[in-house]
Amino acid sequence: MTNVTGTERVKRGMAEMQKGGVIMDVVNAEQARIAEEAGAVAVMALERVPADIRAAGGVSRMADPTIVEEVMGAVSIPVMAKCRIGHLVEARVLESLGVDYIDESEVLTPADEVYHLNKRDYTVPFVCGCRDIGEAARRIAEGAAMLRTKGEPGTGNIVEAVRHMRQVNAEIRQVASLREDELMTYAKNTGAPYEVLLEIKRLGRLPVVNFAAGGVATPADAALMMQLGADGVFVGSGIFKSENPEKFARAIVEATTHYEDYELIASLSKGLGNAMKGIEISTLLPEQRMQERGW
């Protein structure tokens, strides 16, 4: 890779290319091929989908490099992989494997409860989760090229992704309405770096794409998140924990593209079989909420 490949402009541009698409979690080459054939713009290679990570408990780490390489060899679309928050070496290992993006992810057990990675030190672009403009701006300042809502992974429950997307967008509108001399106080109150807030105010949006993630389980869920302003959709457990992964994958891709065509979404939703089993958020203990990881 050349030095140009790792510049902020190129990293953000690579992420921008995924806009409007669906990124699917996969655990092997067969699932990766299903995702690609269904129209996914990228896949996320990991050992277990979030629902299985949640069910298993314990410590969840970076996937075995063999799985990542197997997925990379099976598809022509970009391949992402997750590292633990703050785990310098997992990130370097994934970079050495040649993945297209690294997700510093709260789905895995954090390695560092104080520091996130300085993503500017890496050639590969990073994806990070956020719940509000403070988290979004901090990750951007660290060098994230793509954001996504945290939602509540592995639950099949869209409510938290909706909450986070609405929160971020409401705060963007608030920042856009502030005078520049009011931004420093806003930065202090939210923990958002002042320079990033200035950029958000100037653009009227985040300077990087923001996808929906964490609870997307149906075509209607995907369309909902697009209508709320998502730039695209991550689907973790929703595809391969459903009754018919191939049908669900195609339907979610189509619904993401045609998110205002309600007749099409109705047609896509017919005869899909059962969606993944969902979890009511109020039944989760605080320590079971993955969205609380990171800051």
Swiss-Prot record:
Gene3D superfamilies: Aldolase class I (3.20.20.70)
Transcription found in the keyword field: no
Keyword Lyase included in the entry's annotation: yes
InterPro entries: Aldolase_TIM, PdxS/SNZ, PdxS/SNZ_N, RibuloseP-bd_barrel
Keywords carried by this UniProt record: Lyase, Pyridoxal phosphate, Schiff base
Residues involved in D-ribose 5-phosphate binding: 25, 154, 215, 236-237
GO-annotated biological processes: amino acid metabolic process; pyridoxal phosphate biosynthetic process; pyridoxine biosynthetic process
Enzyme Commission numbers on file: 4.3.3.6
Residues the record lists as binding D-glyceraldehyde 3-phosphate: 166
Active site as annotated: 82
PANTHER family: PYRIDOXAL 5'-PHOSPHATE SYNTHASE SUBUNIT SNZ1-RELATED (PTHR31829:SF0)
Family annotation (HAMAP family): PdxS
Summary of the function given for this chain in its UniProt record: Catalyzes the formation of pyridoxal 5'-phosphate from ribose 5-phosphate (RBP), glyceraldehyde 3-phosphate (G3P) and ammonia. The ammonia is provided by the PdxT subunit. Can also use ribulose 5-phosphate and dihydroxyacetone phosphate as substrates, resulting from enzyme-catalyzed isomerization of RBP and G3P, respectively.
Name of the protein this chain belongs to: Pyridoxal 5'-phosphate synthase subunit PdxS
Gene that this sequence comes from: pdxS
